[in-house]
Amino acid sequence: SDLNPIMDLITFVDVGIPIEAVMVVLSQVPPGFSRRLNLRDGRAYYYQVETLIFGRAIERALYPERYIIGCDDPSQPLAAPYETFLKAHECPLLPMRYESAELAKISINCCLVASISVANTLAELCENIGADWAEIVPALKLDRRIGQYSYLSPGLGIAGGNLERDLTTVCEFSDRLGTDAGVVKAWISNSKYRKDWV
C-alpha cells in the first residue's frame, strides 16, 4: 500500500496542532510505520488498533472489547487525557510497543481468516458427505480451545480489503525476512477458490 498520503496527513496535523496535543492514529499500517515517523520533539503519539466490523461500527466504538495501544515505551504511563478517555469505556487497556500493536492488528485478521478458511473448507466437505455444518458448529463453540465467539460461518471466501491487505503484508514481510508464510498463502488460495466457485 502507498503510505505517503497517511504520512503527509500525519505531518500536516503534527505541524498544525499544539505540541501538548496528543496524536492518535487509527489507520491500518504495517509494522515499523509508527517508529519511522518524524514528529516534532515532545509530541505524544499513539497507534491505536481499530477492529471495525461492517454494520457494527457505532456499537464497537461505544462498547469496545479492549484497546490495543502502540506506544514508544509501554512501561511509561499513557498521556493523561488519552488514558482518561480510554478508561471511561471500562475495558482492558493493552499498551505495547508500536511494532507489536501494528502486528496485533494483522494477527487478529489472520486468526479471523483462519476461521473463515476452516469454515469454508469443512462446510463444503459437509455438502459432499451428507453432514450438516450447522450441527457441527455448536460442538466447536463449546470447545474452550476454539470458543463461543469463533467466527465459523462459511461464505464466499475472504471479504473486505483489510483482511486481504493484511495477508499480503504478512507474505511480503515473510518473503523479505525469509520466514515461512505457506499457511497464509494457502488461505489466499482457498479464498480465491471459493470466489471462483460462484
Question: Which role does the model predict for each range below?
Answer:
Residues 1-22, 32:
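Rossmann-like NAD(P)-binding element
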Residues 127-198:
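NAD(P)-dependent Rossmann-like dehydrogenase/reductase catalytic/cofactor-binding core
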Residues 16, 36-48, 53-148, 173-177:
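Internal alpha-helical scaffold of NAD(P)-dependent oxidoreductase catalytic cores
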Residues 1, 63, 181-182:
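Gly-rich Lys/Arg/Thr-decorated short loops/hinges at beta-loop-alpha junctions or inter-strand turns
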Residues 4-9, 53, 95, 162:
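Short secondary-structure boundary/capping elements
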Residues 26-29:
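Short strand-turn motif at the edge of the Rossmann-like AdoMet-binding core
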Residues 6, 10, 79, 104, ...:
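A general structural signal for well-ordered alpha-helical segments in protein cores
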